[in-house]
Amino acid sequence: MPAIVLVGAQWGDEGKGKATDALGARVDYVVKFNGGNNAGHTVVVGDEKYALHLLPSGILTPGVTPVIGNGVVVDLSVLFEEIDALTARGVDCSKLLLSASAHVIAPYHRVLDQVTERFLGSRKIGTTGRGIGPTYADKINRIGIRVQDLFDESILRQKVEGALDQKNHLLLKVYNRRAVSVDETVENLLSFRDRIAPMVTDVSLELSRALDRDEIVLFEGGQATMLDIDHGTYPYVTSSNATAAGACTGAGIPPNRVDRIVAVVKAYTTRVGEGPFPTELLDADGEKLRQDGGEFGTTTGRPRRTGWYDAVISRYSARINGVTDFVLTKLDTLTGWERIPVCVAYDVDGVRHDEIPMSQSDFHHAKPIYEFFDGWTEDITGARSMEDLPKNAQAYVEALEAISGSRISAVGVGPDREQTVVRHDLLG
């Protein structure tokens, strides 16, 4: 089984880094295929905690080749900040591969992202302000800068000039900001050329050959299904395809090479930024989930919105992605609750919806219909099998599996790599 795709099933921050890292020692390549440094993941190895934003979490596993695919937008300054920080802590980053076709976040992309959000005011999307959306917009408008362009200064300058002809007019006339210098932008981008040269390659070809050798390739999705540009809660979404299909376009592999699709889902729900969230808790219960779960953004540090588990979203994710296995994370965060609600359907203006409403307006007005499950008080962080879990925790996991659309193959009971209950082999 050479290819496995790993995605988030909710609105991100599900613990994909932990799931990727748990698989990492058994795979040969870990490929990031979408997004940029707008999504962070934290991996705990022993007493060491690593916060990654752009690098694939497989970079922490010796022997694994980490890959950044063509579907990623790359802030080169952030890339080398992460590489240098990991190198200083003894992590070998020399095997990293970077697609020549990946698009580059230029300084003006960050500026435009930030001023646009401020300009929108109450209508803002809630971006991280890191230039992700503007870079993808340039890609679609065919005026983007790719990694390979850094190796031809004349082409690079031509592209920067063409982009800034339009963007400086916008900055000056609409946003009342100063113009961005072509020379400074070109100089900034060229400063990274020598450092990226050893890692730049044809990622699609590299991965095709690896799969032909029956090596195991793990495709690691950024963000999550409900933030997908096409299938998420538009317009409150990211700018890339964060569903399993994005692995094919974002890394250059055909769909028939993918053998298994794993979706990571929290035992409750969180969201960062604007947009609908039917099970959101705006009271003391929501704050307790936030504090107990450490729900503060890896990238931004801002508090995450919290709510109960939403099986409607899980079923949707299972269908959209073709999920073969779920990994349930942060079950330990629910320890101590007397009763745990689970959303099994929505009420929209008196009508029951077992699936996500088609219209944005209906989704905004959706009210959760809950079933309730008995909680537990026992410490579960030492559990390594289902039998180690309290009966009520076992019943909760089994209930989520029954209503979520696919089997739950692993359960996270703590932040460490070893704190996982494995029910089914994800690679078997």
From Swiss-Prot:
Residues annotated as the enzyme's active site: D13, H41
Entry's cofactor comment: Binds 1 Mg(2+) ion per subunit.
Enzyme Commission number(s): 6.3.4.4
Reaction(s) this enzyme catalyzes, per UniProt: IMP + L-aspartate + GTP = N(6)-(1,2-dicarboxyethyl)-AMP + GDP + phosphate + 2 H(+)
Enzyme class, first EC level, given as a word: ligase
Binding of Mg(2+), residues: D13, G40
Protein name per the record: Adenylosuccinate synthetase
Tree of life domain: Bacteria
Keywords: Cytoplasm, GTP-binding, Ligase, Magnesium, Metal-binding, Nucleotide-binding, Purine biosynthesis
Similarity-based family: Belongs to the adenylosuccinate synthetase family.
InterPro entries with a match to the protein in the record: Adenylosuccin_syn_GTP-bd, Adenylosuccin_syn_Lys_AS, Adenylosuccinate_synth_dom1, Adenylosuccinate_synth_dom2, Adenylosuccinate_synth_dom3, Adenylosuccinate_synthetase, P-loop_NTPase
Function: Plays an important role in the de novo pathway of purine nucleotide biosynthesis. Catalyzes the first committed step in the biosynthesis of AMP from IMP.
Gene Ontology cellular component list: cytoplasm
Subunit: Homodimer.
PROSITE patterns for this protein: ADENYLOSUCCIN_SYN_1, ADENYLOSUCCIN_SYN_2
GO molecular function terms listed in the Swiss-Prot or TrEMBL record: adenylosuccinate synthase activity; GTP binding; magnesium ion binding
Keyword Isomerase: no
Cofactor(s) required, per the database record: Mg(2+)
Keyword Magnesium (UniProt): yes
Pathway annotation: Purine metabolism; AMP biosynthesis via de novo pathway; AMP from IMP: step 1/2
Residues that hold GTP according to the record: 12-18, 40-42, 304, 330-332, 412-414
Pfam families in UniProt: Adenylsucc_synt (PF00709)
